[in-house]
């Protein structure tokens, strides 16, 4: 496994990541030739200088096309000429210390089956399968029959939620709380990005929501993909023309990690309207894995909400759906939610959903398990409440459209409370 970057407290300079130069994605700026016009226009591509960009939309054929949205609503000024897009690499790695690369030994070639059998004369290749001999007596299907299936085996086949096992519930929560700190993206990473903005990231996440709905992916897959994107951008500078490629590779990795039947690579190439080739997607997947040091089991807001729902007595499906809706709303905007841990965002989403539907407050049982009091939830709760109030006017509407479905009890149509008693 490649070595990981360890960041110190001070901000250090950027080092170029050396990759194959056939796509001219990671070339020395002094040797970089003018980029050729791609066959299909990239999603977040803009002018050569970072600044107010024209309205863009993500490209896809299967997912419904997005409305033209401004991708740079932030106040930026034209930078010096050396920051021109055509004069800088597509990816730049931010390191605080020199990385130590570890080379893996070359893999031995596998021995062919025929060669292996040649060393053992007692082993022979299987011949044609003979049909089974029919039974000479009728099978007894009564309960006393030895052929009858034990009903206890049938009962054991029911799926079990590991979070509901009391013996492990506390250990699981403690482990997730430790890992969420290790897998947390840097809060101010967008300030170090020379060519992308928070609004571009919001467009990308909104598009990934549509991709997840198109392929019926789990909500956890979406949360993981956004975590991978933020952690990748915390260490790498990316040009806007490659931002969708990063998001596509992150969604591919999250699907492989979480889904039973993940979509094929060709499917992800297809939804980008062939803006990127299969080779580019696979190379980016490899790069994301290296930057993340193969740490893919990141705790998410969705995971903590699943634990918190166990304290909901009696169970309330509308509260659960609304909490999931609020948790996904926090994915759209990097500011201010990157400064909060997933467990804290999940607590604020759970309390706000519970208060909206039932008028109840943060349960005492959750306060004991998590250590979060209503007072400690207040900063995140206030931000999430404002996001909830402004959701109908937000530029990105895929999450609201998703939760209008009866599957989620149409919770995005509920009126948020005007005030909170905290």
Curated annotation (Swiss-Prot):
Q: Which residues carry this modification: N-acetylmethionine?
A: 1
Disordered: region residues:
1-62
Q: What UniProt keywords apply to this chain's record, in alphabetical order? A: Acetylation, Cell cycle, Cell division, Cyclin, Cytoplasm, Mitosis, Nucleus, Phosphoprotein, Ubl conjugation
**Any one Gene Ontology molecular-function term assigned to this protein's record:** cyclin-dependent protein serine/threonine kinase regulator activity
Q: How is it modified after translation?
A: Polyubiquitinated via 'Lys-11'-linked ubiquitin by the anaphase-promoting complex (APC/C), leading to its degradation by the proteasome. Deubiquitinated and stabilized by USP37 enables entry into S phase. Ubiquitinated during the G1 phase by the SCF(FBXO31) complex, leading to its proteasomal degradation.
The main place the protein resides is nucleus
Annotated tissue distribution:
Ubiquitous. In the testis, expressed in germ cells and in the ovary, in both germline and somatic cells.
Keyword Lipid biosynthesis included in the entry's annotation: no
In its UniProt entry, what is this protein called? Cyclin-A2
Task: Relate the protein's function as given in its record.
Answer: Cyclin which controls both the G1/S and the G2/M transition phases of the cell cycle. Functions through the formation of specific serine/threonine kinase holoenzyme complexes with the cyclin-dependent protein kinases CDK1 and CDK2. The cyclin subunit confers the substrate specificity of these complexes and differentially interacts with and activates CDK1 and CDK2 throughout the cell cycle.
Where Phosphoserine occurs, the residues are: 5
Record GO biological process: animal organ regeneration; cell cycle G1/S phase transition; cell division; cellular response to cocaine; cellular response to estradiol stimulus; cellular response to hypoxia; cellular response to insulin-like growth factor stimulus; cellular response to leptin stimulus
Family (UniProt): Belongs to the cyclin family. Cyclin AB subfamily.
The organism is Mus musculus (Mouse)
* One matching Pfam family: Cyclin_N2
Where does it reside?
Nucleus; Cytoplasm
Q: Quaternary form?
A: Interacts with the CDK1 and CDK2 protein kinases to form serine/threonine kinase holoenzyme complexes. Interacts with CDK1 (hyperphosphorylated form in G1 and underphosphorylated forms in S and G2). Interacts with CDK2; the interaction increases from G1 to G2. Interacts (associated with CDK2 but not with CDK1) with SCAPER; regulates the activity of CCNA2/CDK2 by transiently maintaining CCNA2 in the cytoplasm. Forms a ternary complex with CDK2 and CDKN1B; CDKN1B inhibits the kinase activity of CDK2 through conformational rearrangements. Interacts with INCA1.
Q: Which GO terms describe its cellular component?
A: cyclin A2-CDK1 complex; cyclin A2-CDK2 complex; cytoplasm; cytosol; female pronucleus; male pronucleus; nucleoplasm; nucleus
């Amino acid at each position: 496994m490649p070595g990981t970057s360890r960041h110190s407290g001070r901000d250090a300079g950027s080092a170029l990541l050396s990759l194959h130069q056939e796509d001219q994605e990671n070339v020395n700026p002094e040797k970089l030739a003018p980029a050729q016009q791609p066959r299909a226009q990239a999603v977040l591509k803009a002018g050569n200088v970072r600044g107010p960009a024209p309205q863009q939309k993500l490209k896809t054929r299967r997912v419904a096309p997005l409305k033209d949205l401004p991708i740079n609503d932030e106040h930026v000024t034209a930078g010096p000429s050396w920051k021109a897009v055509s004069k800088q690499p597509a990816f730049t790695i931010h390191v605080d210390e020199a990385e130590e690369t570890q080379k893996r030994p070359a893999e031995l070639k596998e021995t062919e089956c025929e060669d292996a059998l040649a060393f053992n004369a007692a082993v022979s290749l299987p011949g044609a399968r003979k049909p089974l001999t029919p039974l000479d007596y009728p099978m007894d299907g009564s309960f006393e029959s030895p052929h009858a299936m034990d009903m206890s085996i049938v009962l054991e086949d029911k799926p079990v939620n590991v979070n509901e096992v009391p013996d492990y519930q506390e250990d699981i929560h403690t482990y997730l709380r430790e890992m969420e700190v290790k897998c947390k993206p840097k809060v101010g990473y967008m300030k170090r990005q020379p060519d992308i903005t928070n609004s571009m990231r919001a467009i990308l996440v909104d598009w990934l929501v549509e991709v997840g709905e198109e392929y019926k992916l789990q909500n956890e897959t979406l949360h993981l993909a956004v975590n991978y994107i933020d952690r990748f951008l915390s260490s790498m500078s990316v040009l806007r023309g490659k931002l969708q490629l990063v998001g596509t590779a992150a969604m591919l990795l999250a699907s492989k990690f979480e889904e039973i039947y993940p979509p094929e690579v060709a499917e992800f190439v297809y939804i980008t309207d062939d803006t990127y080739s299969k080779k580019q997607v696979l190379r980016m997947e490899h790069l994301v894995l290296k930057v993340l040091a193969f740490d893919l089991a990141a705790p998410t807001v969705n995971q903590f909400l699943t634990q918190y729902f166990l304290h909901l007595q009696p169970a309330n499906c509308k509260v659960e759906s609304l909490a999931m809706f609020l948790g996904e709303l926090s994915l759209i905007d990097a500011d201010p939610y990157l400064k909060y841990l997933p467990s804290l965002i999940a607590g604020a989403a759970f309390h706000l959903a519970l208060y909206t539907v039932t008028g109840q407050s943060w349960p005492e049982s959750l306060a004991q398990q998590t250590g979060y009091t209503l007072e400690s939830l207040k900063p995140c709760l206030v931000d999430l409440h404002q996001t909830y109030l402004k959701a109908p006017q937000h530029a990105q509407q895929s999450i609201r459209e998703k939760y209008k479905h009866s599957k989620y009890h149409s919770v995005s149509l509920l009126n948020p409370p005007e005030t909170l008693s905290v």
